[in-house]
Amino acid sequence: MYVLPGGVEIHAHGGGGRDFMECTEDAFRGAVQTHMKYGTTSIFPTLSSSTVPMIEQAAETCTKMMAEKDSPILGLHLEGHYLNMAMAGGQMPENIKNPDPNEYIPIVENWHCIKRWDAAPELPGAMQFGKYIPEKAFWLR
């Protein structure tokens, strides 16, 4: 038996020509397999700022895949959509907004696969969001 180091990918939007924003098992599987081929042992599929229906679709796919035996998926990473517009880089501006508990609480309560969520601390509502998220075993970045 050999023990070798492996990478834990905490921020990956896809791989092998597939994007996690496609929200399908085929896309998730293709991207994850590509990462595994090059030494990744565990991964947090990352979504760019997106709509709530897209987050829910990706979370459903992620939940199914995390339940598979020996799944390398540790949880879903949401990069936004609670970001500062001036610092949002390549994010889709129409999806950027301030944290709203009427939006994020149902997402968190319904989708336990979400484990990382990026948010800008200077936004209105961000302090409340920042206090709520760690209570749910998230990494807030």
Language-model-derived ranges and their functions:
Residues 97-141:
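Histidine/acidic residue-rich metal-binding segments in metalloenzymes
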Residues 55-57, 86-92, 129-130:
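Short acidic, glycine/serine/threonine-rich loops at helix termini
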Residues 32, 56-63, 104, 130:
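Generic structural signal for well-ordered alpha-helices
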Residues 36, 67, 134:
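Anion (oxyanion) recognition and catalysis
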Residues 13, 29-58, 71-84, 111-122, ...:
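Divalent metal-dependent hydrolysis catalytic cores, especially in the metallo-beta-lactamase
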Residues 14-19, 84-91:
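A short acidic, helix-capping loop that chelates divalent metal ions and anchors anionic groups
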Residues 1, 58-70:
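Short amphipathic alpha-helices and their capping/turn segments at secondary-structure boundaries
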